[in-house]
Amino acid sequence: MSGKAHGGKGKSGAKDSGSLRSQSSSARAGLQFPVGRIKRYLKRHATGRTRVGSKAAIYLTAVLEYLTAEVLELAGNAAKDLKVKRITPRHLQLAIRGDDELDSLIRATIASGGVLPHINKALLLKVEKKGSKK
């Protein structure tokens, strides 16, 4: 009997079995954030006997990763405008409050974020133009 008559992979059935490594669900989805951890969190905090699908965890992870990248990009631009290399809570505050959609989404108070600079127009001094009369 030859080795091919039996079922299974055997020695010649698998081509380089070392290259078949298991991939994480984050790697399969092409994400940096941990899909498994998000799924575990969803399952733990689901109400009652709610079932959580794997695609729900992947979708939520992708949304969280996108929002984080968006906020970090805007905060990085704010830090670059101020000519510093480190993003601080102040830069996060300026980035979030400067974007209308992020401002409506994130209504939280950012610690050490400060406030946005704003002066009411009624408080500004009126400057008269000289030489306008003829």
From Swiss-Prot:
Keywords: Acetylation, Activator, Chromatin regulator, Chromosome, DNA-binding, Nucleosome core, Nucleus, Transcription, Transcription regulation. One of its GO terms (biological process) is regulation of DNA-templated transcription. One of its GO terms (molecular function) is identical protein binding. It is found in: Nucleus; Chromosome. Acetylated by ESA1, a component of the NuA4 histone acetyltransferase (HAT) complex, and/or by GCN5, a component of the SAGA complex, to form H2A.ZK3Ac, H2A.ZK8Ac, H2A.ZK10Ac and H2A.ZK14Ac once deposited into chromatin. Acetylation is required for function at telomeres. H2A.ZK14Ac is acetylated at the promoters of active genes. Coiled coil: none annotated. Its main location: nucleus. GO terms for cellular component: chromatin; euchromatin; nucleosome; nucleus. Residues 15-31 have a biased composition (Low complexity). It holds the Pfam family Histone. Residues 98-108 are annotated as: Interaction with VPS72. Transmembrane segments: none annotated. The modification N6-acetyllysine is found at K4, K9, K11, K15. InterPro entries: Histone-fold, Histone_H2A, Histone_H2A/H2B/H3, Histone_H2A_C, Histone_H2A_CS. Residues 1-31 are annotated as: Disordered. The modification N-acetylserine is found at S2. Gene3D superfamilies: Histone, subunit A. Present with 2840 molecules/cell in log phase SD medium. In contrast to H2A1 and H2A2, appears to be weakly or not sumoylated. Variant histone H2A which can replace H2A in some nucleosomes. Nucleosomes wrap and compact DNA into chromatin, limiting DNA accessibility to the cellular machineries which require DNA as a template. Histones thereby play a central role in transcription regulation, DNA repair, DNA replication and chromosomal stability. DNA accessibility is regulated via a complex set of post-translational modifications of histones, also called histone code, and nucleosome remodeling. The nucleosome is a histone octamer containing two molecules each of H2A, H2B, H3 and H4 assembled in one H3-H4 heterotetramer and two H2A-H2B heterodimers. The octamer wraps approximately 147 bp of DNA. H2A or its variant H2A.Z forms a heterodimer with H2B. H2A.Z associates with the VPS72/SWC2 subunit of the SWR1 chromatin remodeling complex. Also interacts with RBP1/DNA-directed RNA polymerase II largest subunit. Interacts with NAP1. Interacts with MPS3. Belongs to the histone H2A family. This is Histone H2A.Z. It comes from Saccharomyces cerevisiae (strain ATCC 204508 / S288c) (Baker's yeast). The gene is HTZ1.
